[in-house]
Structures are given as structure tokens and as C-alpha cells.
């Protein structure tokens, strides 16, 4: 397969993934196919975001690492010493992707390390390994292009997380601001009583203890439920089961109480 065709294969993966959640496993598989090597996509903290094996390495420690999807902390930190692509590192390199305890089996093993950079910061590392065949210029072009694509996807995922956080917070703030003073007071007492994300509430008991009507509690819960912040379910004489759906709610409530 020519370089242009291989590049187009990476592009096709990008186009097919448009708008869908990031799938680093598929990315690793595509890079494995076009570069013909083992591929490991490693986050800043050593989490294995995706990997694909072209040539099996029989080693218990490696198997455990892949199962746990976590690279050793020391190795991950050392990768940050590589600011640009470092190719064809042998088994004696501290950056080798081969198990050094089986050095004799992997004498010809070669590793290439490509930093994943996006938005001016180091987001992770793309690691490629082969049992013997040297990584040529075309392989390195594809690896660096692949690392750029992975970096773009990591940034997109981060942006989506930030957006989701902001949306959750805004929904909670709107829901809380829709409550009257007495409803807000009722909600504060309810969640003091629950002491967590979910639990059983007997509205009449809280109403009697705090000195508010039961209807205030019911209205307050309805407002939060219609905003999608909580869900509630009547269990008859036992009371009402309440569960927090928006993880920003209790934090915002705590902030209000501390002011």
C-alpha cells in the first residue's frame, strides 16, 4: 500500500468517526494496519487509551499491563524526556516497549516513540514496536500524522467534557434559582436528611420538624425533577425515594449554604 493510500485510510477513519464518541481502539487498529506494527496510545498518566497488537509478545507482565490498561508510572514519566519523534530504539533503550526481562528473545526488537501534542501541551505518547523490521521514513510520517490525529481527538474529548460540565452546572443553577425561599429551605433540609446522592424521605416528618407545609416540599421536588436534577418516586406509606441525577447539584447546594 502506497503512502498516499495509507494516509487516506487514516483520513477515512477520521471522517467515519465525525460526531461519534472517541474510539482510540479503532484508531490504534487503523494505525497498526497502515504502519504494520504494535500500537500503544498512552495518556499523560500512563493510561492505555487504545492499543492494537500486530506481533504477539508472550510475556506475563505485558499481558497484565494490557489487561489493566495501565503503563508503569516510571516509564510513563520517562517518556516526557522525549520531546520529538525518536525512532528505532533497541532493546537496551530505557524507552523500549519490549519486556527487558526477556531481552534475549527480543534482541532485534525496535521501538519508536512519538509525542502526542495538542493545544501546545503534551497530551500523551504514541508508541510503536516491531520485532525486527526497521521503521522507515514513510512509517514515521504516518506515525506523526497518526499522533496528530490522536491529539486532535483527545482535545475534542476534553472540550466535550468541559462543555458537559458547564451545561450541568447551568441547569443546576437555573433549577435552584427557580425555587422560592421556603422551597430552597425545604430542599436544604431534605438533603441534610438524605446525607448522600439517594435515599428515602418522609415529607410530613420534615415538614413538621422544620415548620413548613408538605406542599412546599412537594413543589420544590417537582421543580428539581422537571429540570432533570433529581428523580423521585412515591413508595406510599414508606415515603418518597429520591435520587440525585446531576452530580453538580449537591456541590451547588453546599456553596449556597456556606454563603
From Swiss-Prot:
InterPro entries associated with the record: CodY, GAF-like_dom_sf, GTP_trans_reg_CodY_C, Transc_reg_CodY_N, WH-like_DNA-bd_sf, WH_DNA-bd_sf
GO CC field: cytoplasm
Biological process per Gene Ontology, one example term: negative regulation of DNA-templated transcription
UniProt keyword annotation of Cytoplasm present: yes
Residues with PTM Phosphoserine: 215
Signal sequence residues: none
Gene3D superfamilies assigned to the protein according to its UniProt record, in alphabetical order: 3.30.450.40, Winged helix-like DNA-binding domain superfamily/Winged helix DNA-binding domain
GO MF term list: DNA binding; DNA-binding transcription factor activity; GTP binding
Keyword field: Cytoplasm, DNA-binding, Phosphoprotein, Repressor, Transcription, Transcription regulation
Primary localisation category: cytoplasm
Protein name as annotated: Global transcriptional regulator CodY
Organism: Bacillus licheniformis (strain ATCC 14580 / DSM 13 / JCM 2505 / CCUG 7422 / NBRC 12200 / NCIMB 9375 / NCTC 10341 / NRRL NRS-1264 / Gibson 46)
Amino acid at each position: 500500500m502506497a503512502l498516499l493510500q495509507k494516509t487516506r485510510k487514516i483520513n477515512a477513519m477520521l471522517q467515519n468517526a465525525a460526531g461519534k464518541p472517541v474510539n482510540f481502539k479503532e484508531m490504534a487498529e487503523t494505525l497498526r494496519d497502515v504502519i504494520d506494527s504494535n500500537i500503544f496510545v498512552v495518556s499523560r498518566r500512563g493510561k492505555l487509551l487504545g492499543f492494537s497488537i500486530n506481533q504477539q509478545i508472550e510475556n506475563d507482565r505485558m499481558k497484565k499491563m494490557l489487561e489493566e490498561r495501565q503503563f508503569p508510572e516510571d516509564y510513563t514519566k520517562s517518556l516526557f524526556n522525549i520531546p520529538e519523534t525518536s525512532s528505532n530504539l533497541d532493546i537496551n533503550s530505557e524507552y523500549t516497549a519490549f519486556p527487558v526481562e526477556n531481552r534475549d528473545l527480543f534482541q532485534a526488537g525496535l521501538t519508536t516513540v512519538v509525542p502526542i501534542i495538542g493545544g501546545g501541551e503534551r497530551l500523551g505518547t504514541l508508541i510503536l514496536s516491531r520485532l525486527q523490521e526497521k521503521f522507515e521514513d514513510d512509517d514515521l510520517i504516518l506515525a506523526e500524522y497518526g499522533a496528530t490525529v490522536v491529539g486532535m481527538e483527545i482535545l475534542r474529548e476534553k472540550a466535550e467534557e468541559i462543555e458537559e460540565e458547564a451545561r450541568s452546572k447551568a441547569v443546576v443553577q437555573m433549577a435552584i434559582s427557580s425555587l422560592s425561599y421556603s422551597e430552597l429551605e425545604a430542599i436544604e433540609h431534605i438533603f441534610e436528611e438524605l446525607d448522600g446522592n439517594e435515599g428515602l424521605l418522609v415529607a410530613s416528618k420534615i415538614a413538621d420538624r422544620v415548620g413548613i407545609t408538605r406542599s412546599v416540599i412537594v413543589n420544590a421536588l417537582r421543580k428539581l425533577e422537571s429540570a432533570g436534577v433529581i428523580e423521585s418516586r412515591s413508595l406510599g406509606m414508606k415515603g418518597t425515594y429520591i435520587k440525585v441525577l446531576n452530580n453538580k447539584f449537591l456541590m451547588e447546594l453546599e456553596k449556597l449554604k456556606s454563603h
